[in-house]
Amino acid sequence: MVKSKLPYVCGIDAAIDVVGGKWKVLILWALDHGTTRRFADLRRELPGVSEKVLIQQLRELAADEVVHREVFHEVPPHVEYSLTEFGDSLNEALRPLGAWGRRHIKTIEANRRPAEFDIATG
Amino acid sequence: MVKSKLPYVCGIDAAIDVVGGKWKVLILWALDHGTTRRFADLRRELPGVSEKVLIQQLRELAADEVVHREVFHEVPPHVEYSLTEFGDSLNEALRPLGAWGRRHIKTIEANRRPAEFDIATG
DNA sequence: GACCCCACTTACTTCTTGGTAAGTACCCCA
DNA sequence: TGGGGTACTTACCAAGAAGTAAGTGGGGTC
């Protein structure tokens, strides 16, 4: 995702900057409805993400105050990730866009791979 | 902007793929409310965009059936860009996200430049 | 004839993002 | 003592998105 230059010229610009990483909306989705997840849980829920990138995006979301990171100093210690209220409001704002994408996902995919076939290649 | 791998795992993934270029939401905004614009108009309305990137993003939006490109074979010939109905529905779906970004733009900007000052540097 | 506008196209470079793979440090269990 | 789990960090590399700059080919204007 391409970062917009600051200052943002409009709200969408800013919002997409927050949400534009390859795995960020998926992380937001995984933490929806007040869900709490550990680092290793998220790894398992996002097949294909590397540890490096997952941490990177979690840190960025935390820096944006969208995700809350809490360390539990128990034995053994662990870390829990959840949405902040701010993150929750972001997820709400994303819902119409998600619905649009879901509604048109076939069209979008088709336009994105004009060289491929939808039928099985023999 | 980072492209998601196909097939998309959720609608947001797909939508952000359509809208994720650096200038795309700005183009969508410029063409909002049935507005029609020429290439040169858009260049002027998006200060900082290069011709190469503007055309590239217009072509991608057209390939996604979000933007309509019409050539007028008059003398002199020219080209007009406008939103399709599909693009219009996308803009509608983007509005809540835009409102969220606008509401929190100060917070987002502040979190995005922790090393800079908001007061003028002397 | 020189210059501007329109709508691009092309070649080259840089910068950012993400991916790969390995290492760290600590704990528990058998 | 070897293996597994937790939560990272680090270094290196590749792909792609965007930026720069120049060229194209038409027309119209002074």
Regions found by a protein language model. Name each.
Chain A
Residues 1-7, 63, 68, 82-122:
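C-terminal regulatory/oligomerization modules of transcriptional regulators
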Residues 54, 58-61:
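Basic amphipathic alpha-helical segments that dock to polyanions
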